[in-house]
UniProtKB/Swiss-Prot annotation:
Family annotation (PANTHER family): OROTIDINE 5'-PHOSPHATE DECARBOXYLASE (PTHR32119:SF2)
Entry GO MF terms: orotidine-5'-phosphate decarboxylase activity
Family statement: Belongs to the OMP decarboxylase family. Type 1 subfamily.
Function comment: Catalyzes the decarboxylation of orotidine 5'-monophosphate (OMP) to uridine 5'-monophosphate (UMP).
Residues at which substrate binds: 21, 43, 72-81, 128, 193, 204, 224-225
Name of the gene this protein is made from: pyrF
Protein name: Orotidine 5'-phosphate decarboxylase
Pathway where this protein functions: Pyrimidine metabolism; UMP biosynthesis via de novo pathway; UMP from orotate: step 2/2
Cellular component aspect of the GO annotation: cytosol
Coiled coil regions in record: none
NCBIfam families reported for this sequence: PRK00230.1 (NF001273), pyrF (TIGR01740)
Catalyzed reactions per annotation: orotidine 5'-phosphate + H(+) = UMP + CO2
Catalytic residues in the record: K74 (proton donor)
GO biological process, one term: 'de novo' pyrimidine nucleobase biosynthetic process
Length: 249
């Protein structure tokens, strides 16, 4: 199982996670081949896993040049189902897998038990697409509407309580999270947008540049469209690695 505590020296690319948000295994395989020397981890989400299943995991193992694998299924179900699913995920040889922190405590405990020390469980706190209005519409009170970070920290505390490897949160909450839970508690951050360049149909609300996320203490930066949409995806990934390198100095 991957642990930040065991990583003595990390290259800039080791912080970069490419989101394989594509519809087919063949297209994903092309990106794995293209980016294996430019990113340290590949993220497999719901659409690709539903379409490709275990094949995409095997593809990354075979062609990813040693890159890590983040299976982002955001499990949320009754405890027994989550336990059995996480146990099956652990057998695939992935490095991280996600579960929603908004679930009951027994579900969180089941996720950690099912992982059996073979995969790092990450708690999804609040989606980076959520705004204050979304939090209000979900039925939360003023305490969380006025400060989404409070809801993130509440859910991060649940993840820490049950021994998760870390959480998924916006770059804006990383600094406070590290201060409270320590540097060894992994922070995986979506909502990353390069200092230069826009993306189409941007549905993220709580965002940051790669450099700022690193300075805040993020351990992994999840990037999809800013790498996928340019004509030269490898160059786009290299440019983000350059931003990471500058922030690490």
């Amino acid at each position: 199982m991957t642990s930040i505590k065991t990583i003595k020296s990390r290259a800039p690319k080791d912080y970069l996670v490419f989101a394989l948000d594509v519809p087919t295994v063949s297209e994903a395989a092309e990106y794995v081949h293209l980016l294996k020397n430019h990113v340290g981890m590949f993220k497999v989400g719901l659409e690709l896993f539903v379409r490709g299943g275990r094949r995409i995991i095997d593809t990354i193992h075979d062609a990813g040049g040693g890159a890590k694998i983040f299976l982002d299924l955001k499990l949320y179900d009754i405890p027994e189902t989550v336990y059995r699913t996480m146990n099956a995920i652990a057998a695939m040889g992935v490095d991280f897998a996600t579960v929603h922190c908004s679930g009951q405590k027994d579900m969180l405990a089941a996720a950690q038990e099912g992982a059996d020390g073979q995969v790092g469980v990450l708690g999804v706190t609040v989606l980076t697409s959520m705004s204050a209005d979304d939090v209000r519409d979900a039925g939360y009170g003023p305490e969380y509407i006025e400060n989404i970070s409070r809801l993130v920290m509440k859910r991060a505390a649940a993840a820490a309580e049950w021994g998760f490897a870390g959480i998924v949160c916006s770059p804006l909450e990383v600094s406070a999270m590290k201060e409270r839970f320590g540097k060894g508690f992994v922070a995986v951050t979506p909502g990353i947008r390069p200092a230069k360049g826009l993306v189409s149909r941007d549905d993220q609300s709580r965002i940051s540049t790669p450099g700022q996320a690193i300075r805040n203490g993020a351990d992994y930066l999840v990037v999809g469209r800013p790498i996928r949409e340019p004509d030269d995806s490898a160059a786009a990934a290299a440019a983000i690695c350059k931003e990471i390198e500058e922030a690490l100095k």
